Amino acid sequence: MQYKKRLFAWITILLAVSCTRETKRMDDYAVQGIDISHHQQIIDWNKVADQDIDFVFVKATEGSEHQDTLFPKFWNDIKKAGLVRGAYHYFSPYSSAEEQAKHFIQTVQLEKGDLPPVLDVEIMDKDQNASPRQSALRWLQLIEKHYNVKPIIYTYQKFYLAHFTGEEFKDYPIWIARYNSPNNPPFIPFGRHWSFWQYGNCGHLTGIKGCVDFDVFHSDRESFEKLLYQSTSTDSAGVQKAL
């Protein structure tokens, strides 16, 4: 019994250490970014911008009803600081793709120069046996129809390989979470390539209290700019048309 208690204590300590290991910047990539939510709370965006940060993904919505409490403020502040911004939706298996797409569209108005919308999908459907791919695909299609741009799929590598290697997903940009492997970038089969890599979840920047996720873009600045949203005509009034 004492052995089991000691073993459990060591496991707890190791997990805590692994989750708080400081993420070092990967400066060999030309385009650098972070992703945030209400957990980051107060941010000095001018200080962040002075540290060679180019883009910021911010959580906008989750499921069919939840909006991140700081999304409106962050969305405006990122723009004012001269950084490229992107909004992501955390997908829930407990409401329909249609409801979730409508919620995102009502919340996020893209402007020229923003990153495409992101679908964060990393949990199974509610019966734990069905793949989320069909619901995710429906969300992606509805969002693409509304904004006229290919959304980005965010997930971790194992989940992507299990659910999103089908032909129907091949044209969507990929944002992969893969930590603690600075010399081992994400692997995407069938000749596909990741667009963004979230390589750590405990980075530190002046202007942000505590940890923040670090990300990089796979290529050069010219390729990055080609990915950015170009239309300026989208607004939430088109929700019913898209759905």
Which residue ranges define each predicted feature?
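Functionally critical loop-and-helix segments that line ligand-binding/catalytic clefts
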Residues: 25-33, 169-243
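Acidic-and-aromatic substrate-binding clefts and catalytic sites of carbohydrate-active enzymes
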Residues: 34-44, 60-71, 90-99, 125-130, ...
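Conserved, mostly hydrophobic/aromatic
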Residues: 48, 78, 119, 143, ...
